[in-house]
Swiss-Prot record:
This is Putative cellulose biosynthesis protein BcsQ. SUPFAM superfamilies: P-loop containing nucleoside triphosphate hydrolases (SSF52540). It comes from Escherichia coli (strain K12). GO terms for molecular function: ATP binding; ATP hydrolysis activity. The lineage of its organism: Bacteria, Pseudomonadati, Pseudomonadota, Gammaproteobacteria, Enterobacterales. The keyword Nucleotide-binding applies.
Length: 242
């Protein structure tokens, strides 16, 4: 929906919760910011990733990292300053990742492939989104997201997940009540504001690993169970659309 709503943190947290429920999970960073790795204790100086490998003519599969016996991570990789400023020069060279992920899906090695997608409208983002059997649009309950819900198209069939909900905020409560009446794809659970969500990135861990007793961690676990009940009839992957 927009940057800063917590998509990357929730992607990491959902991946952790699904593997805690016994699922085999691959979490893929499709954002050039390359931040997802920092939620899985990867060194800041680690430059490798699937996109970096493709741009350097290397095998993208070698960029995968093991976090737990049931959770693997595929970072994006670090771009140079010039690459960051000129994405049109390299984005078209990344399309092979789509066939690679399709092969992984068909292999059955992972029951869930979570893709942290950027909010841009690039070709590679659209290609990756088209691979996803399901998508979650992460929103904050504020006027900004309310406006965007009416002027930005969501992916077909996307569900809307509220993050950073503040108890006691009158404007949030008003907007939330409006959404309950108007947003038919709103998920039946939400993620409340929790300091643990801010702390976990500093600790370089998913929130459920950092503080399993935190309210947000319990709510993400509820989300994971909901995904199992509603998305996993054929063990299909979930994508997160920002």
């Amino acid at each position: 929906m927009r940057g800063g709503v917590g998509t990357t943190t929730i992607t990491a947290a959902l991946a952790w919760s699904l593997q805690m429920l016994g699922e085999n999970v691959l979490v893929v960073d499709a954002c050039p910011d390359n931040l997802l790795r920092l939620s899985f204790n990867v060194d800041f100086t680690h430059r490798q990733g699937w996109a970096r490998a493709m741009l350097d003519g290397q095998d993208w599969r070698d960029a995968g990292l093991r976090y737990t016996s049931q959770l693997d991570l595929l970072p994006f990789g670090q771009l140079s300053i010039e690459e960051q400023e000129n994405p049109q020069h390299w984005q078209t060279r990344l399309s092979d990742i789509c066939s690679g992920l399709q092969q992984l899906k068909a292999s059955g090695r992972y029951q869930w492939i979570l893709i942290d997608l950027p909010r841009d409208a690039s070709q590679i983002t659209h290609q990756l989104l088209s691979l996803c059997d399901h998508s979650l649009a992460i929103v904050n309950v504020d006027a900004n997201c309310h406006i965007r819900l009416h002027q930005q198209a969501l992916p077909d069939g996307a569900h809307i997940l509220i993050n950073d909900f503040r108890i006691g905020s009158q404007v949030q409560d008003d907007i939330y009540q409006l959404w309950l009446q108007s947003q038919r794809r709103l998920l039946p659970m939400l993620i409340h504001r929790d300091e643990a969500m801010a702390e976990c990135l500093a600790a370089k861990q998913p929130v459920g690993e950092y503080r399993s007793d935190a309210l947000a961690a319990e709510e993400i676990l509820t989300l994971a169970n909901w995904c199992l009940l509603n998305y996993s009839g054929l063990k299909t992957p979930v994508g997160s659309a920002s």
